[in-house]
């Protein structure tokens, strides 16, 4: 139960989770907030002892968290063609943002079909979803910046929010800057 934190959190913010046996907190992006139920949905990949410890928690277990942290996304009012661009574990913090937008496009990039997450959640939330995988095992083969270039060239992109690996973010920011499209990266 996250109580007021679920009401205060904004799309793109994150939490610090204190993991047993570790001095360090794990930063985990907020995927979905459920204000009425006072809950936050966190999506993460097990990569070390902290996230391994988290993966053994069960429903009803208590976690110590510090939240909400970070600025979050603040899309401009009235965007007609908003686009969210996510890569890998940068996809979860964009879900809540996409759900808050009118007719968003979600360009989601993954290593493979096996690594793909939340695509149906984005669709249920009202987004037009295009998946790109490095190996072509799901959706289109290539980089997630390719369909973004196409949308910009077609005039179907007037705001971009992106989250993912640094090289992807640098490419997205450069495309946005070149086309004078408002862009936020995280």
Residue ranges of model-derived segments:
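Ferredoxin-reductase
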Residues: 1-59, 111
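FNR/FR-type flavoprotein reductase catalytic core
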Residues: 49-186
């Amino acid at each position: 139960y996250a109580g007021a934190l679920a009401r205060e959190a904004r799309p793109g913010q994150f939490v610090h989770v204190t993991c047993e046996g570790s001095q360090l907190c794990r930063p985990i992006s907020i995927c979905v907030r459920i204000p009425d139920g006072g809950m936050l949905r966190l999506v993460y990949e097990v990569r070390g002892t902290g996230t391994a410890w988290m993966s053994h928690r069960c429903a009803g277990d208590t976690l110590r968290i510090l939240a909400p942290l970070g600025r979050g996304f603040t899309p401009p009012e009235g965007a007609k063609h908003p686009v969210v661009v996510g890569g890998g574990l940068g996809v979860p913090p964009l879900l809540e943002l996409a759900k808050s937008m009118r007719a968003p496009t979600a360009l989601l990039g993954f290593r493979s079909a096996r690594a793909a997450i939340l695509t149906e959640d984005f669709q249920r939330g009202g987004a037009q979803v295009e998946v790109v995988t490095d190996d072509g095992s799901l959706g289109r083969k290539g980089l997630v910046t390719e369909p973004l270039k196409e949308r910009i060239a077609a005039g179907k992109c007037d705001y971009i929010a992106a989250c993912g690996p640094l090289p992807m973010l640098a490419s997205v920011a450069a495309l946005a800057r070149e086309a004078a499209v408002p862009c936020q990266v995280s």
